[in-house]
Design a protein with these regions (language model features):
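Immediate post-signal peptide segment of exported/extracytoplasmic ligand-binding proteins
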Residues: 1-5, 95-105, 290, 295-297
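Extracytoplasmic "Venus flytrap"
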Residues: 3-15
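Hydrophobic/proline-rich hinge and linker segments of small-molecule sensing/allosteric domains
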Residues: 6, 80-96, 208-221
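Short, glycine-/small- and polar/acidic-enriched structural segments
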Residues: 12-133, 138-144
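Short helices/loops that flank or line small-molecule/ion binding pockets
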Residues: 35-54, 117-118, 143-183
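Pocket-lining segment of extracytoplasmic ligand-binding domains
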Residues: 152-246
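Secondary-structure end/capping motifs
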Residues: 220-290
């Protein structure tokens, strides 16, 4: 019997598994070490692999594949978001619409390769015609994948700086990510961003993937049924969460969002499996290539264990 460590946040989708699944099969038990900060957990997983199974932002995972990291994702996506509301700009700097960002310096909360930034840049390029090569990007942190090579239009001189301070000082005119605090003349660049996200879904069928779950390759090779059994346990946990959500009661912020998504998307907002997510995966792998995070566009099938490609969740 082997005990595998699994590190994720306590999302509603995950709680049933964490409370009920100790023994996965005759050979494998799952332990859930006390969760550290998500940024710390992901950075450690990419650089040192201290966990056997770990939550990971999906473009961090794609970038990690580019540099030969020894773990593989399951087709399970435990966080998602629309990113129209993650694009901010300063009207004082003359930014009234997305195209106005061209020629400007735009901050990125955390690293250039973070999934929110990748989706936000995709929105700017594909929905609003912004030429991303004309923007200069300034992350506030380094990359999870330390080997990632600096791009000509990405400048890391603001690492450790606060995005709000950079706006106030006039050193940046826009930003992608979560911008905290009240900043005069600063606001979301896309009007009614929530509705814009749902409109994006109606047009594309995509509810953007943020975080998935990866498993160390050595374990997938040693235990041939592990990927499928983990998928089934994760699906059961998600199904339990959705089936037992007290939609008529007092809801947490997470649960309230889930109910709104069920209504807005017309069903399960968190489908697992490759085919149910092919549109989003194709878009994200294309964006990763277009934004020079990877040297080629990865085929969706390359990203998951072969035995999981036909699973439905």
């Amino acid at each position: 019997m082997v005990t595998l460590s699994m590190s994720t946040r306590d999302y509603g989708l995950m709680l049933h598994m964490k409370k009920t699944v100790g023994r996965l099969n005759a050979d494998v038990e799952i332990s859930y070490p006390k969760f550290v900060d998500i940024l710390v957990a992901v950075r450690n997983m990419v650089r040192e692999c201290p966990y056997d199974i770990c939550e990971m932002p999906f473009t961090t995972y794609i970038c990690a594949r580019e540099y030969g990291k020894k773990f593989t994702a399951l087709p399970v996506f435990i966080t998602r978001n629309f990113h129209h509301g993650a694009i901010f700009a300063s009207k004082a700097a003359g930014v009234e619409k997305p195209k106005d960002l061209e020629g400007k310096t735009v901050g990125v909360v955390r690293g250039y390769t973070v999934t929110t930034g990748v989706w936000a840049r995709g929105v700017l390029a594909e929905e609003y015609g912004v030429d991303l090569s004309k923007l200069r990007w300034t992350p506030t942190d380094d990359e999870h994948v330390a080997e990632f090579k600096q791009l000509p239009n990405v400048d890391y001189k603001f690492i450790g700086r606060d995005i709000g301070d950079l706006f106030r000082s006039g050193e940046i005119c826009g930003a992608v990510g979560t911008v905290m605090g009240e900043i005069k003349s600063l606001g979301p660049l896309i009007p009614d961003a929530v509705e814009a996200g749902f409109a994006f879904y109606r047009k594309t069928g995509i509810y953007p993937i943020n975080h998935g779950i990866v498993v160390r390759d050595e374990l997938l090779e040693r235990y041939p049924t592990l990927a499928v059994e983990l998928f089934k346990a994760l699906k059961e946990s998600k199904d339990f969460y959705l089936a037992n959500l007290d939609r008529a009661g007092a809801l947490s912020a997470e649960d309230t969002l889930t109910v709104r998504l069920e209504e807005g998307l017309g069903g399960d907002p968190f489908p697992y499996g490759v085919e149910a997510n092919r549109g989003g995966l194709e878009a994200l792998t294309r964006y990763a290539f277009d934004q020079n995070i990877t040297s080629r566009k990865y085929a969706v099938e390359e990203l998951f264990p072969p035995e999981t490609l036909d699973l439905v969740g």
